[in-house]
Amino acid sequence: LSLDIKKGEIFAVVGGNGTGKSTAMSLIARIRFPYRGKIYLEGKEIGKYSDDDLYHGFLGVMPQNPQSLFVKKTVREDLYEVIDGKRERKSEAYPIEMKKKDAVEGIVSLTRLEGLLDRHPYDLSGGEQQRLALAKVLLLRPKILLMDEPTKGIDNHYKKELGEILRKLSEHGVTILMISHDVEFCAQYADRTGLFFQGNVVTSEESKKFFAGNNFYTTAANRMARNYFPNAVTVEDVVKAINQTEEEAVSC
């Protein structure tokens, strides 16, 4: 498996079930260990990192099931649990030069959890749980964020909110690798998309080009409009192309 992702890039991986996408991500996240070969992060073999070095300030992992990260009775307590409680003291879990309250408030604002802090995590909607799980991961300030099916079980409203959050993270230099069957989400928010097949990424391109030139892995918008607007891969692309065509017709 060979994969090159630029710093601050949102890279999506699509592919059929059973091709090895989630397995590859679990290896990168050190949830599993390879039978053969080695994995290097920033030139260092992944097995030589301590858990603190790997997961605190370097690698963030978002599982398919966000509930697997919830361990407290309120959203607020769950957030502070990540950074070793509310006490302002240095620890391996929180070596950051920022007051914990300020860090939590910043992440709450980014992930739009205001108004949910006193609720039980299991009482939240699917989209709210996804944002809470992301907030817990982001409190550890990862440079690289791994996401497995981030839009699973959430509606279009929360997909848009999640996409906007990922773009903000990308703008701040966080590198994002996500595995997804949601081709519409990938087309809308990923900078590049790669196709995973038989244990490898066999092709990767800028997302709009990837989906516009693909007959199998493409969006519903592209399938319906490709005879008229072959480069349109999202609903927004189609609407923009139609408006442009109408303007050209009027000007003629």
Regions found by a protein language model. Give the residues of each.
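ABC ATPase nucleotide-binding domains
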Residues: 217-252
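H-loop/switch region of ABC-family ATPase nucleotide-binding domains
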Residues: 180-181
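Catalytic Walker B motif of ABC-type/P-loop ATPase nucleotide-binding domains
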Residues: 145-148
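Conserved ABC ATPase signature
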Residues: 120-124, 128
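Conserved beta-strand-loop-alpha-helix hinge in the C-terminal portion
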Residues: 200-224
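Helix-to-loop junction immediately C-terminal to a conserved catalytic motif
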Residues: 29
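Conserved ABC ATPase "signature" region
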Residues: 95-116
